[in-house]
Curated annotation (Swiss-Prot):
UniProt tissue specificity: Neutrophilic granules.
Keywords: Antibiotic, Antimicrobial, Defensin, Disulfide bond, Secreted
Designated name of the protein: Beta-defensin 8
InterPro entries: Beta/alpha-defensin_C, Defensin_beta-like
Domain of life: Eukaryota
GO molecular function terms listed in the Swiss-Prot or TrEMBL record: CCR6 chemokine receptor binding; chemoattractant activity
Length: 38
């Protein structure tokens, strides 16, 4: 997962920090500093 669209398709969401709670990172959204979490 490397962008906002594929993040959303994979039921993820983009955060500028590390993933909250028990969510795990499945990729990035806009470069490595924006994480795609699910």
């Amino acid at each position: 997962v490397r962008n906002f669209v594929t993040c959303r398709i994979n039921r993820g969401f983009c955060v500028p920090i590390r993933c909250p709670g028990h969510r795990r990172q499945i990729g990035t959204c806009l470069g490595p500093q924006i994480k795609c979490c699910r």
